[in-house]
Amino acid sequence: MKRLLKILILLSLTTPVSFAKTYQPVPSTVKLPAKYTQEYIDSISDEYKNVSDEQIFHVALDMLKGTSGDFSRKAILGYNLTQYPVKVMFKDLSEINEAYSTFDAIGWKKKGKLYIYINPKHEYAPPGAIAALLAHEAIHQDEYNSLSEETYAWTMEAVVWTEILKMFPESNNLESALVTRENILKQLLEKGNHTNKYIKKTVYANEGYKNLPLTSPGFSNQ
């Protein structure tokens, strides 16, 4: 009997202990739509646990449901060319390249996996604006890029932002630099009668894109 008790004690000591995954909550200064209570956010976080530990990204991705950016949401979850979830995080972009220091975000591929790095200056941006940005960056899934691909991605961002404002108008926090970006894109979309006409002109005039080819795999000139 004593021997059996010792065995049971040893088994209990060697049994792996599982802990619930912990997430970084949305900053308290970020205003969320009423739908996004902490209880609701916690209920969706497991779906995005392989993407990020930061719940502000979980909220942003959830906001893409029912928008034109749901394709991007699914791509971030792993339905992309690599078949792996995209890792999303805030990161000082100058650590990658000093030339990226003022960028809002970049998509990156490393060792066969995709990453979306967002400038930390947007840590307190409305999740709806982050959602539109993610819809853009998730379009880039390989090492290639082009003017046509950027035109498509910027247009997608503008369309998604327009849709999110209809669903979550409180996302339009004019104190946010990211919201300023999104509203400029929205204006270009509307100016072109909801076509890419003026967004395309802006992309082609962007000094940072001057060395890009016209097309890339999956993106023809339109």
Sequence positions of predicted segments:
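Sec-dependent signal peptide recognition
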Residues: 2-10
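Hydrophobic h-region of N-terminal signal peptides that target proteins for export
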Residues: 11-18
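Auxiliary, metal-adjacent structural segments of Zn-dependent hydrolase domains
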Residues: 36, 41-115, 173
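Soluble non-cytosolic domains of exported or imported proteins
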Residues: 51, 124-129, 133, 147-148
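Active-site recognition of the HExxH zinc-binding catalytic motif
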Residues: 132-144
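Post-HExxH zinc-binding segment in Zn-dependent metallohydrolases
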Residues: 145-184
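Pan-zinc metallopeptidase signature
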Residues: 190-222
